Structure formats: C-alpha cells, structure tokens
Amino acid sequence: MRVVLLASGVLCLLAGQVLSICSPVDYTLYVEKPECDFCVAINTTICMGFCYSLDPNVVGPAVKRLAVQRGCTYQAVEYRTAELPGCPPHVDPRFSYPVALHCTCRACDPARDECTHRASADGDRCSKPLLLHMHAYPGQSNHIQTL
C-alpha cells in the first residue's frame, strides 16, 4: 500500500512538471540610447512557457478561490551590464539587463514582477545602425536568487 501511495505521489509531481513547461529561452534585445550612435543586439534569456491555470466560468465569491492564475516568471535571475558604443563622454554608456537562470510558475506579484506587457505590433526595431556583437563586462556576476 505504501509503495502505491509513493508511486502516486511521484507521478503527481512529475505530472505537475509536465503540465507546467516554463523555462529559460533565448531572446535578443535591441537597445539604443538617443544620445549614442548605434543600436546593439544583446543576447539574453527570458522565462517563457505554459503554466497550468484554471478560470471557472461561474461568477461568485466562493468560485474565486478555485481560480488558479499562474504565469511563467523568474525564479533566479542574474543582471549583466553591456557598454553601448558611440556614446558621447557625458552619457553613461552602460545598460543593465536580466538573464533568466531558472524559471517557475507562480501567481504574479506586482511588487516584484512585471505582470503585464504589451508588445508593439512592429516588434523590436532599431532607428540607428545595428552592431551585432555585445558582451557583458568580463567576470561580472550579479546573481539574484528569488523564491
């Protein structure tokens, strides 16, 4: 009997992982500053994927407790800094960006997460000449573990 319960528990844990496919994926940011001469493409990772959600069609206070609204968000993130080329001396050429290390499914907390994002219809575009190779400062690590 204990073996059956243990096997059932393990299967439930595995099913939860299968139903929630949320992981870091490659993403390219296009960054430019008005004062600088170039736009740069920065390769990073973001959290993306499917998280199990449940939104009942019935209205009422008791039903609200049944709703499960979770999104794919950062569990561990590291911030890196790139230096934008072609900036005049009075302009700070540094740009910091997040790199997703681990992702998780959880309810959005507006105090710590960006809960909504409206992408432009055109996608990312540069208004200046594009430089394709950007590297973070060597040896930099600003690892932040969140729970």
Swiss-Prot record:
Glycans are attached at residue 43. Disulfide bonds join 22-72, 36-87, 39-126, 47-103, 51-105, 108-115. GO terms for biological process: G protein-coupled receptor signaling pathway. GO terms for molecular function: hormone activity. It is found in: Secreted. GO terms for cellular component: cytoplasm; extracellular space. It holds the Pfam family Cys_knot. SMART domains: GHB (SM00068). Keywords: Disulfide bond, Glycoprotein, Hormone, Secreted, Signal. Its main location: secreted. Residues 1-20 form the signal peptide. InterPro entries: Cystine-knot_cytokine, Glyco_hormone_CN, Gonadotropin_bsu, Gonadotropin_bsu_CS. Belongs to the glycoprotein hormones subunit beta family. Indispensable for the control of thyroid structure and metabolism. May play some role in the biological processes of the immature fishes. Heterodimer of a common alpha chain and a unique beta chain which confers biological specificity to thyrotropin, lutropin, follitropin and gonadotropin. This is Thyrotropin subunit beta.
